[in-house]
Amino acid sequence: YFSNPLCIFGPDEPVPYPSASDQLDYELELAAIIGREGTNIAEKDALSYIAGFTIFNDWSCRDLQRDEMQARLGPAKGKDFATSLGPIVVTPDELEAWRETDPPRGSRWRLRMQARVNGKTLSDNNASTMYWTFGELIAHASRNTRLQIGDVIGSGTVGFGCLLEFPDGTHPWLQPGDVVELEIQPIGVLSTRVVGASGQEGP
């Protein structure tokens, strides 16, 4: 799906709690940033279009998303209110030591991925487990359309990289005042505080 490029938040930038939702969730993803324009990019050539990698928090309103997905259409209000990126962009050559080849599907990166809420670790997995490779994702995203410089391609949420994947009641939905930290080394930590819709923190 396509997200909203007008609602991008950087590292340490607070994210307002969406007023229409009661079920705010984080999503822990690795993101590739496109560095060359291209259309109908072949999987075998796709990595040459990546300028760098960063951490991607694909915030989601699960109650809105659940209602909207019944129509199987998009983009949707459960996804278009915020995307957090950062803290830095790491170039592909800087991650070469973590790259592993998965023929014939392309490359994956052995990067530990963790998520913490208010200092408690809730998610701990690895980017090497991502289902689709970035080669496959870029080839699909560029089919019959043009990828632009600066476009961001998310890996999809790593296993147990969001509250939705835990059994009901195990971990409550996010609230104003919560601090979400997503960590992928050697990229760093993307820290975000959730604030009230008007910018105030919760109790």
Regions found by a protein language model. Give the residues of each.
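Charged, cofactor-coupling segments
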Residues: E68, K77, T83, P87-V90, ...
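A conserved acidic, glycine/proline-rich C-terminal tail/linker
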Residues: T133-Q175
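Generic structural signal for buried aliphatic residues
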Residues: L30, I153-G154, V180
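Conserved S/T- and glycine-rich ATP-binding loop of Class I adenylate-forming
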Residues: A32, G150, I184
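Glycine-enriched loop-and-adjacent helix/strand subsegments that border the catalytic/binding cleft
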Residues: Y1-I138, N144, G199-G202
